[in-house]
Amino acid sequence: MQTQANAKEAAHSKAVRDMFAGIAGRYDLLNHVLSLNIDRRWRRLVANELRDILDRGDATVLDVACGTGDLSLELNKNAKAQIIGTDFCRPMLAVAAEKNSLGADIPFVEADAMTLPFADGSFDGVTIAFGLRNLPNFENGLKELNRVLKRNGKLVVLECSHPPFPVFRQLYSFYFSRVLPRIGGLVSGSRRAYEYLPDSVTKFPEQEKLVELMEATGFDRVKYQNLTGGIAALHSGVRVEALA
């Protein structure tokens, strides 16, 4: 049974990796256009949540599922901490490396978020933006993020979410499931990728459920805030003790 589960998760990861590889070149353009540039503000909020860590010269922050590096670069602005980005999709990392060549000093490492190549307790902060819902197993993914955090280290999760207000939720759902895939498909050449997006968000835990899942996987002081009416949410939690 476990073997079947592992095979299913591996197939999911490969499909997601291949999908992002196919849209890597236009990923940033579509992100900014389809979100009306609101995604930039959301990333700044992630950096603000980690400001006390980013201001420390002895700190290291890991940006997991960093994609084309937008959040890594935002974290790096005016930071004294060392930022490291990881992603399992090489074409996305190639775009990140191009941006990095413009002056930032961020190591980008090809790595799967489910099996990070770092020792236990390596990082003061960990971020994952628009990546957690793409993992094949949310619980195991959160456990892995917990593992690489130091005691009292902070995890910040930025993710597409579920608007709490019924009327807005219905309107947004129509845009997200009917309009966005058509626009995304036309611009990127892959409608499948932008049909996957609303499907993956639908399957992702609602805000309070994600709080519960984070608490169950070793995080304390878990909190969240809805962004832009709840179309995205920012969750954070602190690792207190290692999981048994």
Identify the residue ranges that each predicted region occupies:
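A short glycine-rich, Lys/Arg-flanked "PGG" loop and its adjoining helix->strand segment in the class I
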Residues: 139-151
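N-terminal, positively charged/glycine-rich alpha-helical extensions of SAM-dependent methyltransferases
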Residues: 1-28, 176, 187
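C-terminal alpha-helical "lid/dimerization" subdomain adjacent to the S-adenosyl-L-methionine
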Residues: 15, 158, 162-213, 217, ...
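A short acidic, Gly/Pro-enriched loop at the edge of an enzyme's catalytic core
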Residues: 114-125
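Core SAM-dependent methyltransferase catalytic element
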Residues: 217-244
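Conserved alpha-helix/loop element of class I SAM-dependent methyltransferases that forms part
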Residues: 26, 36-59
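Class I SAM-dependent methyltransferase SAM/SAH-binding core
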Residues: 60-115
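Hydrophobic beta-strand segment of the Class I
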Residues: 27, 126-127
